[in-house]
Amino acid sequence: MGPRAKTICSLFFLLWVLAEPAENSDFYLPGDYLLGGLFSLHANMKGIVHLNFLQVPMCKEYEVKVIGYNLMQAMRFAVEEINNDSSLLPGVLLGYEIVDVCYISNNVQPVLYFLAHEDNLLPIQEDYSNYISRVVAVIGPDNSESVMTVANFLSLFLLPQITYSAIGDELRDKVRFPALLRTTPSADHHVEAMVQLMLHFRWNWIIVLVSSDTYGRDNGQLLGERLARRDICIAFQETLPALQPNQNMTSEERQRLVTIVDKLQQSTARVVVVFSPDLSLYDFFNEVLRQNFTGAVWIASESWAIDPVLHNLTELRHLGTFLGITIQSVPIPGFSEFREWGPQAGPPPLSRTSQSYTCNQECDNCLNATLSFNTILRLSGERVVYSVYSAVYAVAHALHSLLGCDNSTCTKRVVYPWQLLEEIWKVNFTLLDHQIFFDPQGDVALHLEIVQWQWDRSQNPFQSVASYYPLQRQLKNIQDISWHTINNTIPVSMCSKRCQSGQKKKPVGIHVCCFECIDCLPGTFLNHTEDEYECQACPNNEWSYQSETSCFKRQLVFLEWHEAPTIAVALLAALGFLSTLAILVIFWRHFQTPIVRSAGGPMCFLMLTLLLVAYMVVPVYVGPPKVSTCLCRQALFPLCFTICISCIAVRSFQIVCAFKMASRFPRAYSYWVRYQGPYVSMAFITVLKMVIVVIGMLATGLSPTTRTDPDDPKITIVSCNPNYRNSLLFNTSLDLLLSVVGFSFAYMGKELPTNYNEAKFITLSMTFYFTSSVSLCTFMSAYSGVLVTIVDLLVTVLNLLAISLGYFGPKCYMILFYPERNTSAYFNSMIQGYTMRRD
């Protein structure tokens, strides 16, 4: 006997030994094509130990799992409904073979049984393309670990497997599990529904509890990744001790539960997400009740979201609000009556030989246990039941297509698993107003519901309060929830309260949800879309008050025509302009008279013309500064004013030279007269002033500048020169020197003839200019803003008036009111008198 033959014999012997008579007709229905069903009708909740691990556990020794029996009845109901439907698989009878897998204890033996022939032989072959298994498809099991165990076998044969409640994301891997499909949304959508629920109620500080199995670890990790993207923080995550099917909970595990619940008590988080099979939660919630941890929102994963046994712990109502994520409720007409009155037990069909049976096909107490929960099962709606129901119909529609059925007959033939799998992928039909088809990952896009646990017997124990649509990835139809809080207010679960508008976050600790709120300072604002942790400075032309989310334009301040000080100075400048113009006319009409000639002759007209130009520059101080107005302020006006002062200084020097220095230095005086000394001096001073002006403009520029008012930051001062005080000292340095020179020469000529003695007038003009300039610089060091501009303009106009009226005014007075003194004879007599006094 070869090795291959020995292997075949060994498998045959194993299957034959494990085969036992079925005692419950609910588990088997003969038909042309059989469906395999794997359901958890029992679960180990008492820690019954099997010492011999080679022995298949006897599931009936465990406690009845009501939901599992309910789902098994859904499969039976769907098969019988299809068999009674003349439009679907006409003339073909579907049968089923159902096995209790005891949650996760009994998976391998049923799979081998389903894969084997009727004689319990599973041959070893190189090619299974033409292999005929006992069943054409398998419905179940219910949890991810069991599904992966079963799928690893069935995928080798490409035997279709449709699970109705396993949500693990790894099951979407069609390379590993090419024959696996499911009629429930994946964990990706379950977790997204949870996250959107938290976002809707603004919960960003949560606790995550997971089981120690693959289901808990994987889904806990997926949830953590999703929460991190949405700035939702996990206060802490703990692993619940898993209730092993064949073990009692140890003292260490119980102490672990005590520690976890104590940690819940100490935490400020009030939203608890639990990813765990229902079997692991009975002891946990008993400990929660013992420690009286209340006031929390519990978010249940689909594994226990609608568990009637846990719901039967009515004391849970005192712990807080229970919300669960589960598949949508689709009422199935007639199913409740079928579940309640369906057969419970009966002898197996006599036609089945003993070798065709398998173990764990009995449940003596299932119907009685189900009847005790019948009300809650009926009120809770057909949720996972519809997933089983639609899975059976998906196989039926695939068979209908594969057998080439029409409205009356089907062509019965051998169906190979891989052929049926191809057709299942193609199905697209409507079942109870819902479209059933499989996406590329093998999932059906049924929407999810958020349910709230209710303990009022007059209400649905699992009341739907919101819906989640996988295709849109949106949470919709959110209804009012009965919260456990006073006045039914939405519970708060945040590490830190939300910051007010215009407050930045200062992190506290490692969690982004824990922070202090700090007001943004004036001049800064908070842009929530860019950075919630730093206040951004406003642009230079904008400002903000404290705790602002935006800036506003600063108020631009400059001299305006409608202001009273501006009007007053403008009127004063107009008076000076008209006075200077009148003086110019008077001097022009009396050009050849001694007074005009003694005042400088042609030089007077140059001074008066420049004074008129200077008065005309006054309006450029009003209004927003421009390049042109700044040029007039910084170049034209200083140049005009300097030439005027230089004329006075040169004229004073010339008079002193004529009367006092000509006799002492005749040669020097002759050079002065011969080479037009006054005009050469004025030209030199003008060039020097132009150099000073150009240097000043190169240093400061001509473009208007803005600066913030230090006393009122919301105001922006617009000026031609940001450093006007220093610039003023530089530009007026020559003018101040000339004023001192002019004053000195005027003082030296105080004894000259009265007609030529201008000491009083020059002293008045130059002293006023010197004093006003020094006062202006002092004022600018103490004040700023538009007030400096108005004072500067006022001083400028007064300096012009001092020259116009202080220097030229007395001469006009003499010309108009003392014409007898404006004669050559009078001037000669005054000179002779001065000469005689000196002698």
Curated annotation (Swiss-Prot):
Topology feature Cytoplasmic, residues: 588-602, 657-681, 749-760, 806-839
Record-level Gene Ontology MF annotations: G protein-coupled receptor activity
Keyword Kinase: no
Annotated CDD domains: 7tmC_TAS1R2, PBP1_taste_receptor
Matches recorded under InterPro entries: ANF_lig-bd_rcpt (IPR001828), GPCR_3 (IPR000337), GPCR_3_9-Cys_dom (IPR011500), GPCR_3_9-Cys_sf (IPR038550), GPCR_3_C (IPR017978), GPCR_3_Ca_sens_rcpt-rel (IPR000068), GPCR_3_CS (IPR017979), Peripla_BP_I (IPR028082)
GO biological process, one term: detection of chemical stimulus involved in sensory perception of sweet taste
Keywords, comma-separated and alphabetical: Cell membrane, G-protein coupled receptor, Glycoprotein, Membrane, Receptor, Sensory transduction, Signal, Taste, Transducer, Transmembrane, Transmembrane helix
Glycan-carrying positions: 84, 248, 292, 312, 368, 407, 428, 487, 527
Protein family: Belongs to the G-protein coupled receptor 3 family. TAS1R subfamily.
Name of the protein this chain belongs to: Taste receptor type 1 member 2
Organism of provenance: Pan troglodytes (Chimpanzee)
Source organism phylogeny: Eukaryota, Metazoa, Chordata, Craniata, Vertebrata
Gene name per UniProt: TAS1R2
